[in-house]
Amino acid sequence: MHFSLPTSRIVVVVPAAAICIVCVLIETCTAARSHVYTIPLRKGKETSFAETVGEPVRTNQVNVSVEEQKNNIRGRPGLGYYIEVDIGTPPQKLNVLIDTGSSNFAVAASSHNAISTYYRRNESSTYEDQGTYVKVPYTQGEWSGDLGQDLVQIASLGNQSFQANIAAITESKMFFLNDSRWQGILGLGYAEIARPDSSVEPFFDSLTSQTSIQDIFALQMCGALASTNDTNLGSSADGPVEEVIGSMNIGGLDASLYHGTMQYAPLRDEWFYEVIMTDIRVGNDSLGLDCKEYNFDKTIVDSGTTNLRLPVRVFEAITNAIKAHTTKHMPDVPSEFWTGMNLMCPTDSTSPYEPYHWFPTLTLDLQSTNQGQAFSLVVSPQQYLRRDYDHEDKKNCFKFAIAPSTNHAGAVIGAVIMEGFYVVFDRENKRVGFARSTCPGACEKTGTCVGNSPLITEAFNIDFDASDCGYDRSTSYDPALTITAYVLAAICLVCLIPVIVFALTHQINKRCKGRRGRGVVNHHRLDQEGLAENEPNSDP
């Protein structure tokens, strides 16, 4: 599942040719530098983060402690985590996918064979149609519908409602998933990536602007690490599937949901939750790539994407390194396993958990908010080897949860990585926090833990500027913009040709007239001189 938006930041480069038409109108065409236009960002308030830990969530109507927001999200392996919301008057209960990789709040508004219920806007007395069509394509799937507004309540926040923008989905393709149990998507990103444009206020912005809830939320997703069920793993239309749980804390943190110290990565920009990755290690060995490659063209934290996705070159490097660690113990792993096209199923003679022992830990180093430092997320094999069930052969199998990014989508720290940690989206202070999760560890019960992973290290010094690892999107190449530039250049050339012809004609005519004038004068002088020579000499 991959529901983050596929687009990079929109950066429009207007070459000098594009302004030539204006130059013609003012009779002068001058060579000009290219100009870069970006959408300005909205800056949040600077507040003390410590005040939010364990504090009651203050709203217009009720006080809700973050400790009361435990186990309020559910999910299915590979199908995402969802939270219950009430929409409209009278309230209609729906489950919505929690997605930090997009910014639209959208729910099904018509029947679909993959969902059991949908939003009936005509039955809500508080629904307001905005008269705007919206379409959102994802890397996987898309939906379209009508933009409107209605009252929304989050069940775990108590009797608290606010007005939110809602897209009523009327058409979709590869979006709703069988057995997922959710009927919509809750985009928690920033306004800059909202569709159809940034004027659509996102859900969390509406929540914090209409209440006194602080601009922060946290996710604890207890998926792979808490899973102990040996059968019916993953999704299937053939029968019941395993359900996983978690917590979404809105307005503060619950200190009982994490161990140790929280480490923070600064938000590079406010669109996706973009951070900077400084290195990747397999076991104890660095991939040794230029750090810019890890972040081409961005690195985001996205709960709506299942896998760890990496730029193609990085994916190839990490896959080769993992293969080198596992080949000695597991030489028969099918090649299609590494591309996600096939499952790896242990033989009858091996423990269903044995592969965890032969696969290495992964370490993702992230830029720290401490100047000149980074910190590490140590990822267990139990996170990136997703358990699945082969219903045909009745076997417990594994799926490789690392995949290459498509269409320059960059690196995506998806759900399989987030499931090992308590992840804080501190929008007020423009940072993302990570701490070790208190989710019950299934590996401890089954004896499949590898080292102490997953874990998070203290911040450590680095001898380079981590900001230099970020990808410079101002140089991004956009074929559509390039074609537009060429078209404008052609129009400019067509407009300039008459001007050039006119200028040349004018200069030629001017010179010709000058030459004719000088020719008459010179001829007259010659005639006068000739007459003087022919006159008789009057001197004696």
Swiss-Prot record:
Top-level EC class as recorded in UniProt: hydrolase
Protein name: Beta-secretase
Pfam family, one: Asp
CDD domains for the chain: beta_secretase_like (cd05473)
One annotated Gene Ontology cellular component of this protein: trans-Golgi network
Catalytic site: D99, D302
Family annotation (Gene3D superfamilies): Acid Proteases
Signal peptide: 1-31
Domain of life: Eukaryota
Subcellular location as annotated: Membrane
InterPro entries: Aspartic_peptidase_A1, Aspartic_peptidase_AS, BACE, BACE1, Memapsin-like, PEPTIDASE_A1, Peptidase_aspartic_dom_sf
EC number: 3.4.23.-
Main location: membrane
Cytoplasmic side: 504-540
Disulfide cysteine pairs (residue numbers): C222-C439, C291-C469, C345-C397
Membrane topology: Single-pass type I membrane protein
The Peptidase A1 domain, residue ranges: 81-435
Family to which this protein belongs: Belongs to the peptidase A1 family.
GO molecular function: aspartic-type endopeptidase activity
Parts of the chain that traverse the membrane: 483-503
GO BP field: amyloid-beta metabolic process; membrane protein ectodomain proteolysis
UniProt keywords, alphabetically: Aspartyl protease, Disulfide bond, Hydrolase, Membrane, Protease, Signal, Transmembrane, Transmembrane helix, Zymogen
